[in-house]
Design a protein with these regions (language model features):
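Histidine-acidic metal/acid-base catalytic patches
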Residues: 1-2, 64, 118, 144, ...
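Conserved, mostly hydrophobic/aromatic
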Residues: 26, 58, 76, 87, ...
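Acidic-and-aromatic substrate-binding clefts and catalytic sites of carbohydrate-active enzymes
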Residues: 8-16, 29-43, 63-71, 102-107, ...
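Active-site acidic/histidine proton-transfer and metal-coordination neighborhood
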Residues: 66-159, 251
Length: 252
């Protein structure tokens, strides 16, 4: 079965409408700057129906999942649960969550993160949405690749593997090691290109990532793949989708 290839659109319905054509789904950002009660649900449904596309969501980018303060952790669970309830109500299939903690290098926080992740995963399941936890180990509050993989396996949580993030953290070798050890957990991919000097979310082919490594591990992948390239140039987005499809043996 071919992978399902979509595009990330941030929190803008205008961008969603302008870029959706030709993609199987969109990944729409919610929370923080785009609270669910501010989203025009009817317009969202109409755009998706007209394009024949599905919906995934991205939970707040800067929201830590775990701290040492129980009251804050409870608030995080409640907040994410509310967003997931909305996501399920509008038919989202998956919800992406950054794998972050107040201090990801504090080993005492790891079991707390595991408990938080399991609770959010359960809330997603109750809403009819699959939670996927994303690697952001190149960022200050992101867990390192292997730690996130271990925590995802411990909690039975699916993974959103961001190829560019993994490269920024540990190069092509890091991509290879994570896929070798945890590839069976991956149901959602973020694809884009990067350069080690700090450029990220570039069109595939414009950076340094060896997508041959991705092909070795995910050839024939039948999950969801989101093109996360920061441009509104539709031709460029479609070219990255084509390149991703080639790497994954998915026809476009």
């Amino acid at each position: 079965m071919d992978a399902t290839i979509g595009v990330t659109v941030g929190d803008s319905l205008d961008r969603l409408e302008a870029t959706i054509d030709g993609f199987d789904f969109v990944e729409f950002a919610i929370g923080e700057g785009a609270e669910p009660d501010e989203v025009d649900d009817e317009r969202l449904a109409s755009i998706l129906a007209e394009a024949g596309a599905d919906l995934c969501v991205h939970l707040p980018f800067k929201q830590d999942v775990a701290t040492h303060v129980p009251e804050i952790n409870a608030g995080i669970r409640d907040y994410l649960g509310r967003l997931l309830e909305w996501a399920g109500g509008v038919g989202a299939e998956k919800a992406v969550l950054h794998g972050t903690a107040r201090n990801p290098h504090d080993t005492d926080l790891r079991p707390i993160f595991a408990d938080q992740l399991a609770a959010v995963d359960a809330a997603a399941a109750d809403a009819g949405v699959e939670l996927v936890v994303e690697n952001v180990g190149h960022q200050a509050r992101g867990f390192p690749l292997s730690v996130l993989g271990d925590l995802a396996r411990e909690t039975g949580t699916a993974v959103c593997f961001d190829v560019g993030h993994a490269y920024m953290e540990d190069g092509d070798d890091g991509v290879d090691r994570f896929c070798s050890g945890y590839g069976d957990l991956v149901s959602h991919l973020h694809v884009h290109d990067v350069r080690s000097r700090g450029d990220t979310h570039l069109p595939i082919g414009a950076g340094e990532v060896d997508y041959g490594v991705v092909s070795e591990h995910f050839g024939g992948f039948d999950g969801t793949v989101a093109v996360e390239v920061f441009t509104d140039d539709v031709d460029m987005l479609r070219d990255s989708a084509r390149r991703a499809g080639t790497a994954l043996d998915a026809e476009r």
